[in-house]
Each structure stands twice: as C-alpha cells, then as structure tokens.
Curated annotation (Swiss-Prot):
Name of the gene encoding the protein in the UniProt record: queC
Catalysed reactions listed for this entry: 7-carboxy-7-deazaguanine + NH4(+) + ATP = 7-cyano-7-deazaguanine + ADP + phosphate + H2O + H(+)
Keyword Lyase in record: no
Annotated function: Catalyzes the ATP-dependent conversion of 7-carboxy-7-deazaguanine (CDG) to 7-cyano-7-deazaguanine (preQ(0)).
Domain of life where this protein originates: Bacteria
Protein name: 7-cyano-7-deazaguanine synthase
Length: 220
C-alpha cells in the first residue's frame, strides 16, 4: 500500500483524525473529504480544514445538505435534543449518512486515482448506529466495486477497538497530543476536551482516562 493513494472520510474529530494519521503512514498519497450536511456546528468543517492544512493534506468539502432535508436529527437541528432511549436509535443517528458519505467518497476516490477509502467507523463503540457495523461496510464495499467496476478497498482501522485503544493508536502514531488538542468531537462544538457533558465527550473522556491509566501502569 506504500505506493498507493487513499481518500480519508474526515470530520476533524478524534476518530477520523486518528485514521488520517494512520493513512499517512500506510499510503504514499492521502486526500481528505469532509461532508457539509448542515451539521449544527459549522466549526466542524472549519476544524477539518485547519487540520488538513496543517498536515499538508489536500482537502475537499462536498455539499450534502440534502441529508438535513431528508433525515432531521439532533446533529442538524437545534430544536431536537440529544437523547438515547433504551432500545432505540440515538437522536444523533443520521439516516443514510455513512452509506452516502462512503459512496460519494468512492466517486471522488476514483476521480483522483485512489482505490483505498479510509473511515473511522467502529462497531465496538458504535452507539447503536447500524451504519457503523462491519457487515455494512463490507457489503457496501462489494456494492461500490460492482457499481463502478473498480477495485475499491474500504479500510476501517478502528472497527474492533474501543476508545481507549483509539487513544493508544494515536499515541503509537505520534499524534496523541495533536488529536487531544486540535480535534472536534463535542456535539456542542468545543474543540479539544470539549464540554464534558454530551455523549460524545463522555465517551471520549472515558476512553482517554482508561488509556492514561493503562499507560501510567505500564511505566510503573
């Protein structure tokens, strides 16, 4: 893979930034693609652009605002609260998001001569999102290959690891401080450690605390 090119689905968050650093080590050339689906915080797109610029990565932003029209949810509508009732999908789930993002990323990848697509979806911490499952990604990979007659390979470096191991991976990639300080995971639009209260921040902090404890234990 060292001589090949990849496109990273990139939001500027912890997971996709870790995947970006992973891709930079795996491939000769890397591009990033971010999707504007009228998410609550436009800062997400700005954050992604700033990270890509700092790392010298070509960055494309695609307009996916149609998603907001089709699938109202807590990530795009300020009048919808962020909730997760037992047995139901979280209000932050955007119907069809990863299906569309990966499909459009594949179209872009083919246009720029890349066959590798990298995404930060994770089944371990998938929070009830059906489009973060390994079975979905593998199925879509086959569908994309058939639909465009092109040998795409979708990579999911985080699929089987939890948030603590995601922090560990960023550390192994030499990107721990960068990811901690410059990424945007918070649903309330606060870069770095975030608000500490939304589900995304709580998951991120729990993973960070666990990893830091493990790292200190290993040094002892």
């Amino acid at each position: 893979m060292k001589k090949e090119k990849a496109v990273v689905v990139f939001s500027g968050g912890q997971d996709s930034t870790t995947c970006l650093f992973w891709a930079m080590q795996q491939f000769a050339e890397v591009e990033a693609v971010t999707f504007n689906y009228n998410q609550r915080h436009k800062l997400e797109i700005e954050c992604a652009a700033n990270i890509a610029k700092e790392l010298g990565i070509k960055h494309t932003v695609l307009d996916m605002s149609l998603l907001n029209q089709l699938a109202p949810n807590a990530l795009t509508r300020t009048d919808i609260d962020i909730t997760h009732e037992e047995g139901e999908l979280p209000s932050t789930f955007v119907e069809g998001r990863n299906l569309l993002f990966l499909s459009f990323a594949a179209v872009l990848a083919k246009q720029v001569g890349a066959r590798h697509i990298v995404t930060g979806v994770c089944e371990t911490d998938f929070s009830g999102y059906p489009d973060c499952r390994d079975a979905f990604v593998k199925s879509l990979n086959v569908t994309l290959n058939l639909s465009m007659d092109y040998p795409f390979v979708i990579h999911t470096p985080l699929m089987w690891i939890d948030k603590a191991d995601t922090w560990k991976l960023s550390d192994e990639l030499g990107a721990f401080d960068f990811v901690r300080e410059k990424t945007l995971t918070c649903y309330n639009g606060i870069i770095g450690d975030g608000c500490g209260e939304c589900p995304a921040c709580q998951l991120r902090k729990a993973g960070l605390d666990t990893y830091l404890q493990e790292r200190e234990g290993a040094k002892a």
